[in-house]
């Protein structure tokens, strides 16, 4: 699962526009996935669904390595059972899996941008331990973080080589036109 709605960059504050966009996107997602397909989606479930997304997408609560079902339920003012049921029903996983998915996607972003070393990555992404990070990353991505990083670096190098090749070809074609 990728980030559900918004790609984020490091920011210190969330604008009302970002919040509004997320909530509208969540409402559309709700309609497409649940309301229009005969799945019983209660209004109160929709409100909690949007609240969960807001806290994950905008507030990035998944970066807290001590975030638990109890702590998250207190944060969003609901009970643990109800939060667990909504996550299970509408995200098709449990809360731990959902948080780890967000953490791994965030780790992929940091690796892709070259903003973080592999050593500091587990802590920056909200994992309590390095082993939990490696296990979750491998399960979700299908390869180790080191292998993912190597693939990203190879892709970047390949993109650079293609860009240089295309630029050189374009330059040579332009020089040929000038000589004619």
Task: Give a label for each model feature.
Residues 5-112, 161-164:
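Membrane-proximal linker segments that couple transmembrane helices to downstream signaling/catalytic modules
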Residues 77, 126-127, 174:
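Central "turn" residue of the DNA-binding helix-turn-helix
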Residues 80, 129-130:
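The DNA-contacting recognition helix of HTH DNA-binding domains
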Residues 68, 94, 117-118, 129, ...:
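Residues that mark the N-terminal boundary/hinge immediately upstream of a DNA-recognition element
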Residues 121-122:
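Hydrophobic positions on the alpha-helical face of helix-turn-helix-like DNA-binding modules
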Residues 166-176:
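Conserved small/polar residues in nucleotide/adenosyl-binding loops
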Residues 87-93, 136-148:
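A secondary-structure capping/hinge motif
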Residues 83, 132-133, 137:
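Short hydrophobic/aromatic patch on the recognition helix
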């Amino acid at each position: 699962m990728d980030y559900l709605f918004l790609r984020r960059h490091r920011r210190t504050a969330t604008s009302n526009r970002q919040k509004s966009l997320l909530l509208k996107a969540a409402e559309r997602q709700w309609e497409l996935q649940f309301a229009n397909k005969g799945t019983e989606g209660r209004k109160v479930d929709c409100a909690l669904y949007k609240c969960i997304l807001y806290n994950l997408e905008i507030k990035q609560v998944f970066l807290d390595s001590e975030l638990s079902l109890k702590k998250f339920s207190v944060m969003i003012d609901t009970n643990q059972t109800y939060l667990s049921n909504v996550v299970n029903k509408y995200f098709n996983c449990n809360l731990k899996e959902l948080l780890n998915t967000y953490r791994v996607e965030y780790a992929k972003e940091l690796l892709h941008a070259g903003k973080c070393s592999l050593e500091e990555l587990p802590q920056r992404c909200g994992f309590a331990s390095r082993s939990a990070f490696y296990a979750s990353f491998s399960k979700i991505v299908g390869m180790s973080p080191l292998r993912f990083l190597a693939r990203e670096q190879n892709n970047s190098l390949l993109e650079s080589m293609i860009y240089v090749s295309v630029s050189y070809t374009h330059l040579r074609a332009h020089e040929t036109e000038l000589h004619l």
